[in-house]
Amino acid sequence: MREVASTRTDGRVKRLPPLFFTGSLMIMAGLGLYFFGIIFSIFRLILQLQEPFRAWNMALIWYSGFPTTIGVCLAGLDLALLFPAKRRESRRKILAPVTDKHVVVALTAYNDEKSIGPSVADFVNHPLVKRVIVVDNNSRDRTFDNAQEAGARVVVEKDPGYGRCVYRCFKEALNEDGDLIILCEGDMTFRAADIDKLVAYIEHADVVNGTRIVEQLRDYATQLSTFMYYGNFFVGKLLELKHLGRGTFTDVGTTYKLIRRDSLMRLMPRLNPAVNMEFNAHFMDTALANGERLIECPITFHPRVGVSKGGNVSNVRALKVGLRMIMGLLFGWPGA
């Protein structure tokens, strides 16, 4: 079932259908049929095909106007009636002041024995961090021991998968005493120094999502290739189109994010841990559909310590993850 955009007012969620998003898809479908009909016409003339091919060809071109027209009407209706309300809601400046800015940090880890120790130490030594949790997703090396020695509380998530590891991070963080929760990876690609930036944004949002879009903040030798960079940006804009008026989104693949406890508690029943490498896009889409305010914050991005095992292993794997993200945004996430 397709999720719908929403706004949250006084604790209630007012659901607004994503007419612009649906209309845009119908316009693209109509134009696709039209251009297919034109190409078919060229081949029909070259091959000198007569009836019934001519009738099929003309029907394809003429009927392509129906989804295009309906799509234009839906998009126009959204822009005229719904967009102002969604944009007005998203521009409310202060959600709620944060009195205690200390955070609980939850790190995902899988066979990260080389990086998890330095990563935990980096977060433990930050003055705003009150607790570091590491969720070990059945590592076969010394990840558990190294994380524990560095000062983290370590738990093992036996069910494999990035989504299940992240979901367990959320559950463990909610068991701690703290109103602000950081989700991150234990591979040293992200640093604790960016916590200050994330916390600075949280008074304006329920969720602050890190973005690696700023070139000057990325190390030259990261696993984020040019293909991954622009593919990630494209999916971010698709998310923005789906939730038009709710914000600007440029990075759907970043694990690093700061979440208010009450927001995460609202989202937990809606999240599906079976969603794997595309879980971050699933999280953002679900948060926006639930009426949470989501803001992006530029963060630094560094080379990975150890061997990458996620969606950044290669461009081919990144393409597969990206396509699953697109399918989730268009047709809904498994179990949603």
What are these regions (language model features)?
Residues 1-97, 272-336:
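Hydrophobic helical membrane-anchoring modules
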Residues 77-128:
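N-terminal signal-anchor transmembrane helix
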Residues 112-115, 139, 162:
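Donor nucleotide-sugar binding loop of glycosyltransferases
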Residues 123, 137-138, 160:
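Conserved short acidic donor-positioning loop in nucleotide-sugar-dependent glycosyltransferases
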Residues 128, 149-151, 290:
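Short, structured coil segments at secondary-structure junctions
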Residues 136-144:
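A conserved acidic beta->alpha catalytic loop
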Residues 158-160, 164-173, 180, 192-273, ...:
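Acceptor/aglycone-binding surface of glycosyltransferases and processive sugar-polymer synthases
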Residues 177-189:
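Short beta-strand-to-loop acidic/aromatic patch adjacent to the donor-nucleotide binding site
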